[in-house]
A protein has these predicted regions:
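Flexible, glycine-rich terminal cap/loop adjacent to redox cofactors
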Residues: 3-11, 23-139
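Short linear capping/connector segments at secondary-structure termini
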Residues: 15-21
């Protein structure tokens, strides 16, 4: 926007995989495809979820929790969506948007060393698939 309006340089904006956040309590952050969108686009979709109470909530006595979900095209192993509800969701999804935009794979996430103790470490330690959707060949 700034380059186009103030720098007088037209910039083509890529509207795919733009992160979005809702600054409610708890925050909601999302980037990429939803499960439904991925299922419509890909033959096999894997979903990884983590629901937990972050350490800072535990230490402070807060009951707040975080839900994270990765949506993966199983055919390419590419992470095509990430959805987070909880503290710092906007900050987390902004960074994950880089990985989604770069077409990072679930294996890339798995190979990333986790920074402990953070909520973000859940994104690279989700090893157990929680759902797999296989499109009916007749559909």
């Amino acid at each position: 926007f700034a380059d186009t309006v103030f720098g007088k340089r037209a910039v083509k904006v890529d509207h795919i995989d733009i992160p979005t956040a809702v600054f409610t309590q708890p925050q909601v952050g999302t980037v990429g495809l939803t499960e439904a969108q991925a299922r419509a686009q890909f033959a096999i979709v894997d979903v990884y979820k983590a629901a937990f109470r972050p350490l800072k909530a535990t230490l402070s006595g807060s009951e707040s929790r975080v839900l994270m979900k990765l949506v993966v095209d199983a055919g390419s192993d590419r992470v095509v969506g990430c959805h987070i509800v909880g503290s710092d969701a906007a900050e987390l999804v902004q960074v994950i948007a880089i990985a989604v935009k770069m077409k990072a794979t679930k294996a890339d996430f798995d190979a990333t060393m986790a920074l402990h103790p953070t909520s973000a470490e859940e994104l690279v330690t989700m090893r157990t698939r929680t759902a797999r959707y296989v499109r009916d060949a007749a559909a």
